[in-house]
Amino acid sequence: MRLSQLLVPTLREIPAEAEIPSHILMLKAALMRKLASGVYIYLPLGQRVLRKVEQIVREEMDRAGSQEVLMSALIPAELLKESGRWDVFGPEMFKLKDRNERDFCLGPTHEEVFTDLIRNEVKSYRQLPLILYQIQTKFRDERRPRFGVMRSREFIMKDAYSFDVDWEGLDKSFNKMYEAYCRIFDRCGLKYLVVEADSGAMGGKDSKEFMVISSIGEAVIAYCDNCGYAANEEKAECLINQEIVEEMLPKEEVYTPNVRTIEELVNFLGITPNKFVKTLIYKAKDNVVAALVRGDRDLNETKLLNILGIREEELELADASIVEKVTGAKVGFAGPIGLKGEVMIIVDNEIPQMRNFIVGANETDYHIKNVNYGRDFKADVVADIKNVIEGDKCPRCGSPLKIDRGIEVGHIFKLGTKYSDALGAKYVDEEGNEKPIIMGCYGIGINRTVAAIIEQHHDEKGIIWPMSVAPYHVIIVPVNVSNEAQNRVAEDIYAALQKEGIEVLIDDRDLRAGVKFNDADLLGIPIRITVGKKVDDGIVEIKLRENEEAEEVKISDVVEKVKNIIKEKM
């Protein structure tokens, strides 16, 4: 392809809306343009990269025995009402009515549609196991679209669903998809962790996320270098110190005038935060919940939601009037002793192993010292409701955990019979008995994968595409298009590479060499062939985008050299 004919309007300045490297570079390198908040259109180079990633996904899904289909993006409300999810998604789901006032949505996900297909088409155990997948556009009305395609309102996703006769079959399908995902992300040139995760609104269990380590990632990951344990913040656990050597002391009320926060208490009492227990009052649907965690910990609301069995929008911190009603004190002095009315107390599993900690007294301007679980108060539920922190002990081997940030590019989990029960997807077994089909779900964000690749493969000059997903493998840059010899050699190499089936760009624009080199670096094409002054000596220059060194090569050897580089890098 000739650069003079390609729609590639590169930008010199950083767009004001862009905050992270992938967003900045996808705009500067003319991969995409913004149409509306969280909505993007893809230009030729961006489309080629998307197709490259999709092709890798297709090859590995097909290799794993999955079959490609294409479902409708427009989904009738009846299907989601059958599963009970019409209201679960809340305002994130784009809802609309047709001219007959029939409710539809733009698909945020497709569990119900796949299950509906299978309940109508699969009747016997002889038709199972089965894995189907699609690459389709999804729609979610994000409250705050940000970071370009990392969190957008329209995105391309590969979603697959497995259908088996039993859990043993699901385990096999799950492992096939796990291995396929590893191959996909390896081929895309990504460094990633596979972490234990929460299934969220999709339901199911044995949930794993494929996380690309990145400082701009929205997810927090805990992992262990020693044994390989990894989990996202919503699922991460740690070992609790079981050894209690301190004796219980008599509890004592302490006057703490206008001292409300942990930080203020630390300064006022001169005691470290891990000796405090904070009590957070929540409104959970129609109930009031007191959730207790250690003073230096953050409460994990996803863990709390799972314990309560309610949706995210049904849980919120209680307002001042509710806090004052159940504690009898102003905000900042809540504690577990003497709460008024029906309050469910949920205590983090670390607290029963603590001794002589400090809590709010449920009395304005007072706290209580030397409080102990069991002696002074009890809980309705003791469970893990905290976020782990750097240095916590790994739940598997006891080594210190590390904390990092990551970008979720893939998610696999076992749905079981959640949707087959709800929609009546059954099969007849060998004995003639009807049984629910056992399902699994497997998703990859295509656009997000592209952005994650850029996050891991860029420098101050631009993108550094891995060969497997690069829009073109080679860019030829004649330094001076007015020089007949340079033009002739550049065109000859261009034709020879095309003949070999190599994806090649030629920068035939009448621009200064520096501008061309800058664009080549910005676009991130893996191999640059520079045709310059040494052309009369039969020499051109080959430079790989991933490093600074250039190599002089005989013109007669260029094609073979390029073929070998591509073979090595693919």
Swiss-Prot record:
Indicate the secretion signal residues: none
Give the record's keywords alphabetically.
Aminoacyl-tRNA synthetase, ATP-binding, Cytoplasm, Ligase, Nucleotide-binding, Protein biosynthesis
A single GO BP term for this record reads:
prolyl-tRNA aminoacylation
The compartments listed are: Cytoplasm
Any one GO molecular function term = catalytic activity, acting on a protein
- Catalysed reaction, written as an equation: tRNA(Pro) + L-proline + ATP = L-prolyl-tRNA(Pro) + AMP + diphosphate
Question: Which top EC class is given?
Answer: ligase
Q: Check the record and name the CDD domains matching this protein.
A: ProRS-INS (cd04334), ProRS_anticodon_short (cd00861), ProRS_core_prok (cd00779)
State which Enzyme Commission number(s) the record gives.
6.1.1.15
Cellular component terms, GO, for this chain's entry?
cytosol
Principal subcellular localization = cytoplasm
Quaternary structure, from the entry: Homodimer.
Q: Which family does it belong to?
A: Belongs to the class-II aminoacyl-tRNA synthetase family. ProS type 1 subfamily.
Share the domain note from the entry.
Consists of three domains: the N-terminal catalytic domain, the editing domain and the C-terminal anticodon-binding domain.
* Function recorded in the entry: Catalyzes the attachment of proline to tRNA(Pro) in a two-step reaction: proline is first activated by ATP to form Pro-AMP and then transferred to the acceptor end of tRNA(Pro). As ProRS can inadvertently accommodate and process non-cognate amino acids such as alanine and cysteine, to avoid such errors it has two additional distinct editing activities against alanine. One activity is designated as 'pretransfer' editing and involves the tRNA(Pro)-independent hydrolysis of activated Ala-AMP.
Protein name per its UniProtKB record: Proline--tRNA ligase
Q: Lineage of this protein's species?
A: Bacteria, Bacillati, Bacillota, Clostridia, Thermoanaerobacterales
Gene that specifies this protein: proS
